[in-house]
């Protein structure tokens, strides 16, 4: 405040008192934490760093929409925390490439291929199928789960349908080919059945360990490609169980040393009672009500490890395997307790523990992994680190249903990611996910997708309109027109919407509300643009561009628009107009000129290999890049940038035509050769012998071999004799020619 | 904790207690606030919204490096607050297009063009120049400021230099053409002088108001183009004084109504004493020590408004004009007090007040605007809104010096932005700014720019190397190799650096420290890459790519790398993100492989012409397109897409070095030849003649030509004779060698 004297001479020397504004209570990010089943304020443990571990796929088959449900939602959460809230996220994911499902599937595929390669006789196959049906029927009767039962019945029915025709073919001794086709059909239908049976009988003799790594490596590559296609960011670090076995062994050993694990018959089990009774720990933090649920526990133990003897090794049925002794036919690794392999739950504890240490901020996974997998992970790690906070925030993505039903192979509603991407683009799928909450069930149906498509179209129209407005020619000062009330009001709405969107993202990343707020903002812009149009006035370019850039920016944060992920300084300086043609043509020109220079020298100096290399460049390599070189004698080669697919089709067509031409030429050459051979064969016959073999026409011949009497001994007429004489002379000429050729050796 | 009973039957029904982690005290953004001359914690008034007003340019001439100093630094601050700290920034800037400088410049240009179009006779021009020199000399004598005085003297001198030749041409009645050329030269040199004189005499008769809008509109366009070239983001809203006169009039009226302004002789002045004495207000918040500084105040009143009568209209010399009555020849707008135009300070208060209301978060401007401009803005607005917090945080960018000196037209070190961009790219300028604190003085010198160029090169080589590593063909699972200690350590450094960078940005957006931290991070990566190369192992692609993407992202936030600002959904579906690199590299790869194939055959079949063609492609043709081929014996050629200018400079450098080497080689060969010739010449002398020519040393010789007596006829001592004998024998040997060579003709 001014000094009381009010005297204003040379001015006070001191700046007045200042205090920061009160500001408003900033709304903070809350996340739904499965550890409390509540939305909790999110506080990272160390500044802005967020350590995050997500359970990756078990890689033994194509990834399906259930995977998409989890990995697209976690991708959205990760991007929002990283790019919107600016947390410094360190995101790790594992690949389960050692697992009973993998072992079983690899062994079955291996044994079935071996069986098929031996090309069993029809009868043998029929016998084996019958043998395989016995254990199958037992399993069918024991199955209670309706979905699974239905699936097994379907297999049984298909096998019967394929068996009958083969039996008939065998009984009616049909040809090899017809039997073989029935064999093929039965082999295909009974594949699962036979594989199971072969595995149960021959599984333990399998010693080729490579089959247990080839299968997962293939499906891991497939998984990455699917994720790329869905625009899911790769993890910051990826861990594979097969590469962390030593760390897992140490992890198990320490749990045993800490008194929470015990060795039994070559396997090691986790002592849940011991752990639960300790003051420092709690078992079953996520799903306490599931503790003791044997069915869930068994599923966690893996198909090859739920035999009765395994159960007997445990002190309590609630205990679970940390390390499993391997039976013959199962891959194994050395360890203090004999030869075996990791249990399922321990992998994640060991790998996440190695990378993220004693306490991570976020652990994510699918909803159905809560128990036993995640609860057991928590127990293992808290037993290892002797703490009670291995995971601070546990996030579970909701289920995915297909048109209301659970997705399962039996209901034939099993949709792979590749299938889904044939029907919709990655962006449309992602918009659908954004329009749902990440933690609730998402029904993947035509309705769901229809509303996503509508949304995409609504937004796209808006972007196109704004781009059109921005293209209107205006001088550089014209883009900044004075704001009237409408601009001020639209701008106010814009900032209010941004605040609302911020609030929604703070509320457990509620993207459904965000998408509605974005839709409302676009509607407000549409109203503004229409109002300006009505009074023949140009809408304010800078304001509309700002709003459109904000919406594009949010879509990029959500991964619905691909971010330009180029590295470092863009080459070519600012504003290099990146139309493909203008960009690429200079480089192609250089390639073409270099090729021509090289061909010229090669022709002059007779270096055919270089000419072939130049042709291969034109015909095989460049078409792959959508480039067509057209060589014209004596003229510079014409360079064309064409749509790649069209070009490849053209190449195929050219090859087909060339192939046909080649075949025709070959055909013609063959026929010519045959004619020559026939001609030669004809020339070879001495005229004197030419008629002798025609005993079906003539009965007597003169001394030159010319026929004199026909079959019935009747003397030939003058006309007939004259005609034969002519043939005789013609042959004489040919024969002379033949002798001539034989002389100058032209028959090499 | 587990329930005390330890009984683990069906499991407890309740999840254990959970509490959020303590987390660490997040470091918050502090900004240096000129209102306290301290770094203050930055708290926006309403959630994440940040209202921000920046004083834009007075548009009457080309923008210079002083402008760049302010607008690049504010662009960096704005981008960091918007894209890094994710504040919801609303950034307004004005264009001063009504101002005494504009009025004077427009009128002078107008009158001078009229004078020139009348094509004055030589004699008339000479007379007028003399007339104009009178007031000019008065002004020169009155000028105290050393810079200004030097500039006026320079003009005076130049005019004299141009006057003499014209006078002579007139006296010696030279041809029309010669006279005209002298007239043109004098007109050009005396332009400022004549314009001033014409304006002082004819200014008041100018009535064509359009000249007062054409000049600023032109230079506003020029300013926007310069900003675009510097990659400075356009403001969210731009206000022009000429479009806000009604709002300004109301603003002045309300200040008068509130009792802080008074009308005097058609102008309106701000009553600083009244304002300062009020309990609710303080005057001179930014620079209290400058209150009363008449010189500074006068500069704020504008060149046309500091006449003595204007001063007499003020109640106190500290008062300043809110509204100025317009004199003839000055543009004017209707208002309650007759015809006039806005004062300088009131524009910003009125425009910012209209858009941002009673209290904004940030006001920015150049350091030398603190007093009187910004202090008067504060007074006006707080008088209007009757509050004491019109601006919460006042940010001033530091000065710019040119190689240590103040930039000024008189010192001829006045560098326009266009000049600067001819010498360096916008990115290099921005890197230089980033490597300095935004609030301190920045010296624009070759040193400053050299360190920026070094920095750019250091980063660019890193990006190129990472891109080369990422191109190494690896199957899709290969990009995720298991982390060893080196990867874990590099990753730890990476996250520590990100934390350090966050801390530096919180500390008043200290980009200088950030750039050093980024440099250190690159060095750590280089060490890691070198270590992996040393043990013939591939570096971890995913980790290096992550780090490179982070650095690129930070450079984009700082505006040093252009952001892809396309709107909406990219055309052409996913993966067509048209980064030049991704687009062009496949074609370059094909060119490189074709070249390698051709070189291989050419070497095998000894076709040197093709090898020369391949070298020419690498050395002459591809650099033009910014492509660098690096051939490594026995390894595939490394393809690098580099900035074209850098590459051409490199090629020039390479040629210069090769040229130098060639010259050195030639030089050495020439010297060698000379030595050999000298040696040969020496060998040719028969020993008998070798001393004969040395008559300055010896007077008598024996029969073999050996000297016996010195110059004075004195016999040589034994020692001397012995020494000469030795020389004689050495020459004998050489001579024999020479005869030998002559015989076997080795002198072609």
Swiss-Prot record, chains A, B:
A motif ('HIGH' region) lies at residues 57-67. CDD domains: CysRS_core (cd00672). A motif ('KIIK' region) lies at residues 101-104. Gene3D superfamilies: HUPs. A motif ('KMSKS' region) lies at residues 406-410. It holds the Pfam family tRNA-synt_1e. One of its GO terms (molecular function) is metal ion binding. Signal peptide: none annotated. Binds 1 zinc ion per subunit. One of its GO terms (cellular component) is cytoplasm. Keywords: Acetylation, Aminoacyl-tRNA synthetase, ATP-binding, Chromosomal rearrangement, Cytoplasm, Disease variant, Dwarfism, Ligase, Metal-binding, Nucleotide-binding, Phosphoprotein, Protein biosynthesis, Proto-oncogene, Zinc. Changing residue 341 to H: In MDBH; 50% reduction of cysteine-tRNA ligase activity. It catalyses: tRNA(Cys) + L-cysteine + ATP = L-cysteinyl-tRNA(Cys) + AMP + diphosphate. L-cysteine binds at residues 56, 96, 373. One of its GO terms (biological process) is cysteinyl-tRNA aminoacylation. The keyword Magnesium does not apply. Residues 653-679 have a biased composition (Basic and acidic residues). It is linked to Microcephaly, developmental delay, and brittle hair syndrome: An autosomal recessive disorder characterized by developmental delay, motor and cognitive disabilities, brittle hair and nails, failure to thrive, and short stature. Homodimer. NCBIfam families: cysS. This is Cysteine--tRNA ligase, cytoplasmic. It comes from Homo sapiens. The lineage of its organism: Eukaryota, Metazoa, Chordata, Craniata, Vertebrata. The gene is CARS1.
């Amino acid at each position: 405040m001014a000094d009381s004297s009010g005297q204003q001479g040379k001015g006070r020397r001191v700046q007045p008192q200042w205090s920061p504004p009160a500001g408003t209570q900033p709304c903070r990010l809350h996340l739904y934490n499965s550890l409390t089943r509540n939305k909790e304020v999110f506080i990272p443990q160390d500044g802005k760093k967020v350590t995050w571990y997500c359970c990756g796929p078990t890689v033994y088959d194509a990834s399906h929409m259930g995977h998409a449900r989890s990995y697209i939602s976690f991708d959205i959460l990760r991007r929002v925390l990283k790019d919107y809230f600016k947390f410094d996220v360190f995101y790790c994911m594992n690949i389960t490439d050692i697992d009973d499902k993998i072992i079983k599937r690899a062994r079955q595929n291996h044994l079935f291929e071996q069986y098929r390669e031996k090309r069993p006789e029809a009868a043998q196959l029929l016998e084996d199928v019958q043998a395989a049906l016995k254990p199958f029927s037992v399993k069918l009767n024991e199955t209670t789960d309706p979905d699974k039962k239905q699936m097994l019945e379907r297999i049984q029915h298909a096998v019967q349908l394929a068996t009958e025709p083969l039996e008939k073919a065998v009984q009616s001794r049909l040809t090899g080919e017809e039997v073989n086709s029935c064999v093929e059909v039965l082999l295909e239908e009974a594949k699962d059945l036979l594989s199971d049976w072969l595995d149960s009988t021959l599984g333990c003799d399998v010693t080729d360990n490579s089959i247990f790594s080839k299968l997962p490596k293939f499906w891991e590559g497939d998984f990455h490609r699917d994720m790329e296609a869905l625009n899911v960011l790769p993890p910051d670090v990826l861990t594979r169980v097969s590469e962390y076995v030593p760390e897992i062994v140490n992890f198990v050993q320490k749990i045993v040393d800490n008194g929470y694990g015990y060795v039994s018959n070559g396997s090691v089990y986790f002592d849940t009672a011991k752990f639960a009774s300790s003051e420092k720990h709690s078992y079953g933090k996520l799903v306490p009500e599931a503790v003791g649920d044997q069915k869930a526990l068994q599923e966690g133990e893996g198909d090859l490890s739920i035999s009765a003897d395994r159960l007997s090794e445990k002190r309590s049925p609630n205990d679970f395997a940390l390390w499993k002794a391997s039976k013959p036919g199962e891959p194994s690794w050395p360890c203090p307790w004999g030869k075996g392999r990791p249990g399922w739950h321990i992998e994640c504890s060991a790998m996440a523990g190695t990378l993220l240490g004693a306490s991570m901020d976020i652990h994510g996974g699918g909803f159905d992994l809560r128990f036993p997998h995640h609860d057991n992970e928590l127990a293992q790690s808290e037993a290892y680190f002797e703490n009670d906070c291995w995971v601070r925030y546990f996030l579970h993505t909701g289920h995915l249903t297909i048109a209301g039903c659970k997705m399962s192979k039996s209901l034939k509603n099993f949709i792979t990611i590749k299938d889904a991407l044939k029907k919709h683009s990655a962006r449309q799928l992602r918009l659908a996910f954004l329009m749902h909450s990440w933690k609730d069930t998402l029904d993947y149906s035509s309705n769901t997708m229809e509303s996503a498509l509508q949304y995409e179209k609504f937004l796209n129209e808006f972007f196109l309109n704004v781009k059109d407005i921005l293209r209107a020619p205006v001088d550089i000062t014209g883009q900044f027109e004075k704001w009237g009330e409408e601009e001020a009001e639209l701008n106010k709405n814009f900032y209010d919407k941004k605040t609302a969107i911020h609030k929604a993202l703070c509320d457990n990343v509620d993207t459904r509300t965000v998408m509605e707020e974005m839709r409302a903002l676009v509607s407000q812009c549409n109203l503004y643009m229409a109002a300006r149009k009505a009074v023949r006035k140009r809408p304010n370019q800078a304001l509309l561009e700002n709003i459109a850039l904000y919406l594009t920016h949010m879509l990029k944060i959500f991964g619905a628009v691909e971010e330009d992920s180029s590295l470092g300084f863009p080459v070519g300086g600012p504003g290099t107009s990146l139309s493909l043609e203008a960009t690429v043509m200079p480089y192609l020109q250089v390639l073409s000129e270099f090729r021509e220079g090289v061909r010229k020298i090669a022709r002059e100096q007779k270096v055919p290999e270089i000419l072939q290399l130049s042709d291969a460049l034109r015909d095989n390599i460049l078409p792959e890049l959508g480039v067509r070189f057209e060589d014209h004698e004596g003229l510079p080669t014409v360079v064309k940038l064409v749509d790649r697919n069209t070009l490849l089709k053209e190449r195929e067509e050219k090859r087909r035509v060339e192939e046909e031409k080649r075949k025709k030429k070959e055909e013609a050459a063959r026929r010519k050769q045959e004619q020559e051979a026939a001609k030669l064969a004809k020339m070879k016959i001495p005229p004197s012998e030419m008629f002798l073999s025609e005993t079906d026409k003539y009965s007597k011949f003169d001394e030159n071999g010319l026929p004199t009497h026909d079959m019935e001994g009747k003397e030939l007429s003058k006309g007939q004799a004259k005609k034969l004489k002519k043939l005789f002379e013609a042959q004489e000429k040919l024969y002379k020619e033949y002798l001539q050729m034989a002389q100058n050796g032209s028959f090499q």
